[in-house]
Amino acid sequence: MTTTKTAVLSEAQDTQTETNREIAIDFLTRAARGEARDAMRRYAAPDFVHHNPWFAPDAASLATAMDANARENPQKELHVQRTIAEGPLVVVHASVRHQAGDRPAAVVHIFRFEDGRICELWDVGQEEPADSPNTAGMF
């Protein structure tokens, strides 16, 4: 009996983890298109906190900044390269170009979920150097 309950819990956790992965990708896709406010309404928990050092930690401040960036960069492209999801955490490694012809930046977003909502978000990014000795690249 314990095995059956464990299997059912594991399947439910796997389903929620996959849902979290899909939400994280949709959140970033919407934000890149200038729909960060909508993404926050859809997916952020009421007590959402982000850890980007350039903005206040609340959802509204981050959404304002993300939407402003999308307006300033209407040709912005976000391409998800890979994701890692385990339990309440989802990591998205993406390439981002703000303008056509720009070098891509490697950006990693780390999401923490509670009850199917994004409750915490971290992000780090680095522009791909034009002259790098690493022939494997950043992606």
Question: Residue spans of the language-model regions?
Answer:
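C-terminal and inter-domain tail/linker signature
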Residues: 1-139
